[in-house]
Amino acid sequence: MGTRDDEYDYLFKVVLIGDSGVGKSNLLSRFTRNEFNLESKSTIGVEFATRSIQVDGKTIKAQIWDTAGQERYRAITSAYYRGAVGALLVYDIAKHLTYENVERWLKELRDHADSNIVIMLVGNKSDLRHLRAVPTDEARAFAEKNGLSFIETSALDSTNVEAAFQTILTEIYRIVSQKQMSDRRENDMSPSNNVVPIHVPPTTENKPKVQCCQNI
């Protein structure tokens, strides 16, 4: 049973990055609306869509942002990355140049996004296996070397699209919830929370002194 879109426990912003034409918009539409458009044109500017999933009984609302990979849209970079807690870095398994550019996209992401952002490398268009130009093992090794998770997907036939988003959102949730638990523990152990106020009656030194020998 689905939840109302305005009822959620966590809201996570996830960005899609990578060269134009690698299938970012179709990954977004496949996950959020279960749609695929063969005539999909390059995204102009920025668009985002939302979908909620359940993790550990909590409702996670994913706000997934998509933008064109072409150089002329670079001006939106800072606003695009601001507040993002996850990123899918997408390349086309049938176009090696889109994989070569992953390193540049990763640098831009790390220059502009939060240092703790969760990143997944996504080899899209796995249905084009007969045209494969990027070996799976090569991409997986790159991901491991750079601390990224890795998956191959096909927005066309839906392969691993659900798994990609579920995996990154679950990882973000684990990190956020662990941080919340850690923060609570620190608060519980902080000196201010262990102080028991003690009322100390005024000592004789603090009592007002009675002046004597007046009016003599």
Swiss-Prot record:
SMART domains: RAB, RAN, RAS, RHO. Regulated by guanine nucleotide exchange factors (GEFs) which promote the exchange of bound GDP for free GTP. Regulated by GTPase activating proteins (GAPs) which increase the GTP hydrolysis activity. Inhibited by GDP dissociation inhibitors (GDIs) which prevent Rab-GDP dissociation. CDD domains: Rab11_like (cd01868). Residues 214-216 form a propeptide. Signal peptide: none annotated. A motif (Switch 2) lies at residues 67-86. The modification Cysteine methyl ester is found at C213. Changing K41A: Mildly decreases SH3BP5-mediated guanine nucleotide exchange. Disulfide bonds: none annotated. The small GTPases Rab are key regulators of intracellular membrane trafficking, from the formation of transport vesicles to their fusion with membranes. Rabs cycle between an inactive GDP-bound form and an active GTP-bound form that is able to recruit to membranes different set of downstream effectors directly responsible for vesicle formation, movement, tethering and fusion. The small Rab GTPase RAB11A regulates endocytic recycling. Belongs to the small GTPase superfamily. Rab family. This is Ras-related protein Rab-11A. It comes from Homo sapiens. The gene is RAB11A.
